[in-house]
Amino acid sequence: MIGIIGAMEEEVAILKDKIVNLEIINVAHVVFYKGRLHDKEVILTQSGIGKVNVAISTTLLINRFHPDLIINTGSAGALDKSLGVGDIIVSDMVAYHDADARAFGYQLGQIPQMPAQFVADSHLIELAKEAINDQKWVAKSGLIVSGDSFIGTAEQRADIKTNFPQAMAAEMEATAIAQTCYQFNLPFIITRAISDLADGDAGITFEAFLEKAAIASSQIVDRLIKTI
């Protein structure tokens, strides 16, 4: 079984409409959509926004449905200047940009007793790249950073780039999903479409281009599931 997680309704609606033999299951105020997509058994959920919401949803998904892997779909703000709205970013690793336990000898972004970064599954990365190349999307792979703030000012963006110069994009859930998968020893991949440029116009751009980003990220997941 393939687990699929998106934070917002727009990020899961397209995939939900493609699922056949759909069964809707409610667990602890989290809605799960179970069925088949490209003849693969899938379980899809809209987790809600932020690290705690998505950690709860991911844990419920894993404990209740026992997926073989997790795919995270959705949108992100670009931190790398080579990325534009509608482009695709595939994580090779993820990290928190808002965790700081350096007083105890940990790296910036590292949760105590956890890795500094969480590494995505290499096989899933290759499959995602193949799916992207088939459709000729503009895509990059690299570090995605997560935190419980929407990055909507130039100052926020500059702070993250200072602390994490390799970061390609920022969003609010991916690293919490990755940490949960790490705890359960489950492979994961993060695929995000760029909805904004994480700058002073990010709020306006996000609202305008969320649908475009949702379509692009859903298409990537759809193609990826075909190849798994």
Swiss-Prot record:
**Which principal EC class is assigned to this enzyme?**
hydrolase
Q: Keyword Glycoprotein: yes or no?
A: no
The alphabetized UniProt keywords are: Amino-acid biosynthesis, Hydrolase, Methionine biosynthesis
* Any Gene Ontology biological process: nucleoside catabolic process
Enzyme Commission numbers on file: 3.2.2.9
Amino acids binding substrate: G77, I151, M172, E173
Q: Pathway, per UniProt?
A: Amino-acid biosynthesis; L-methionine biosynthesis via salvage pathway; S-methyl-5-thio-alpha-D-ribose 1-phosphate from S-methyl-5'-thioadenosine (hydrolase route): step 1/2
Q: Which reaction does it catalyse?
A: S-adenosyl-L-homocysteine + H2O = S-(5-deoxy-D-ribos-5-yl)-L-homocysteine + adenine; S-methyl-5'-thioadenosine + H2O = 5-(methylsulfanyl)-D-ribose + adenine; 5'-deoxyadenosine + H2O = 5-deoxy-D-ribose + adenine
Q: Which GO terms describe its molecular function?
A: adenosylhomocysteine nucleosidase activity; methylthioadenosine nucleosidase activity
Q: Which domain of life is it from?
A: Bacteria
Q: Name one GO cellular component term.
A: cytosol
Which Gene3D superfamilies does this UniProt record tie to the protein? Nucleoside phosphorylase domain (3.40.50.1580)
Instruction: Cite the active-site annotation.
Output: E11, D196
Instruction: Relate the protein's function as given in its record.
Output: Catalyzes the irreversible cleavage of the glycosidic bond in both 5'-methylthioadenosine (MTA) and S-adenosylhomocysteine (SAH/AdoHcy) to adenine and the corresponding thioribose, 5'-methylthioribose and S-ribosylhomocysteine, respectively. Also cleaves 5'-deoxyadenosine, a toxic by-product of radical S-adenosylmethionine (SAM) enzymes, into 5-deoxyribose and adenine.
* Annotated family: Belongs to the PNP/UDP phosphorylase family. MtnN subfamily.
Q: Which HAMAP family match?
A: Salvage_MtnN
What's the protein called, per UniProt?
Answer: 5'-methylthioadenosine/S-adenosylhomocysteine nucleosidase
